[in-house]
């Protein structure tokens, strides 16, 4: 199941959180969900060159709080904050409520799955060989601390007639383990031959809970010993030369033929 299901949805409430955090009743849910999708599509097109990894939308008390995670926050903010103000005004017009926009910087873009997928698709659109782009991204991710990475490309690779799928993996990518911190990203490259899809899985270690608390593994002794008797308590006759369990002076030697009882 872990091979097919979406890695983020599989780990919700275990080690991942929702990208849209709000509650609505049955009458308003569909409209708010459609609003979220339109806002994400708008930000994806508007901030195409800003290296946006993910967008979190929250709706507390007739307001909206949008957090944009980007590796290039200066591009989002603009000169003297002009671009961010225009962006906030457009979002308020679309959502109809006061909007607060927060910008969070991604410290290591080489290990962010969505940014890796976007980078590969941009290279494919520039007609760079897909194998070279995939292997370069894998090397950069492993060099900067990722414990495993898997990249899959599907479509008319290199312009061939029949579409195919190729993937490469380096390190460990435990998709079935719920406590594993798996970052997943997907992007599409629009080439002259058609659309090429790129999926990226990045394994960053094991975590427990949404606070990303690392798992502490205690070293285990491989030597398994059977529980012995307490020191100092020994059965009678054990460990002594010529002794047996019942003890006795002559118990350890075989009786000689001449040792028969008198009178026989």
From Swiss-Prot:
Domain KH type-2 intervals: 39-107
GO biological process: translation
Region Disordered, annotated ranges: 211-264
Entry-linked SUPFAM superfamilies: Prokaryotic type KH domain (KH-domain type II), Ribosomal protein S3 C-terminal domain
GO cellular component: cytosolic small ribosomal subunit
Keywords, alphabetical: Ribonucleoprotein, Ribosomal protein, RNA-binding, rRNA-binding
NCBIfam families xrefs: rpsC_bact
Quaternary structure and interacting proteins, as annotated: Part of the 30S ribosomal subunit. Forms a tight complex with proteins S10 and S14.
Family affiliation: Belongs to the universal ribosomal protein uS3 family.
Record protein name field: Small ribosomal subunit protein uS3
Organism, as annotated: Cupriavidus pinatubonensis (strain JMP 134 / LMG 1197)
Classification lineage: Bacteria, Pseudomonadati, Pseudomonadota, Betaproteobacteria, Burkholderiales
């Amino acid at each position: 199941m872990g091979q097919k299901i979406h890695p983020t949805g599989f780990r919700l409430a275990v080690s991942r959180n929702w990208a849209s955090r709000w509650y609505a009743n049955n009458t308003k849910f569909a409209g708010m969900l459609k609003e979220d999708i339109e806002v994400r599509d708008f930000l994806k097109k508007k901030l195409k060159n800003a290296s946006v990894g993910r967008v979190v939308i929250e709706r507390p008390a007739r307001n909206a709080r949008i957090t944009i995670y980007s590796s290039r926050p200066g591009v989002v903010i603009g000169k003297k904050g002009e671009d961010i103000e225009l962006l906030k005004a457009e979002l308020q017009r679309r959502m109809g409520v006061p909007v607060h926009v927060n910008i969070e910087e991604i410290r290591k873009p080489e290990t962010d799955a969505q940014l890796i997928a976007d980078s590969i698709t941009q290279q494919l659109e520039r007609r760079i060989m897909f194998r070279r782009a995939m292997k370069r991204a894998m090397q950069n991710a492993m060099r900067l601390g990722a414990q495993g990475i898997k990249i899959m490309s599907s479509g008319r690779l290199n312009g061939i007639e029949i579409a195919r799928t190729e993937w490469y993996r380096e390190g460990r990518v435990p998709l079935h383990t719920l406590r594993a911190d798996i970052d997943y990203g997907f992007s599409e490259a629009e080439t002259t031959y058609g659309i090429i899809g790129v999926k990226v899985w990045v394994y960053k270690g094991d975590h427990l809970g949404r606070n990303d608390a690392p798992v502490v593994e205690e070293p285990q002794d491989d030597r398994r010993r059977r529980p012995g008797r307490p020191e100092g308590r020994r059965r009678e006759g054990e460990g002594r030369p010529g002794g047996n369990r019942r003890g006795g002076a002559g118990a350890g030697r075989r009786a000689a033929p001449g040792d028969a009882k008198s009178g026989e």
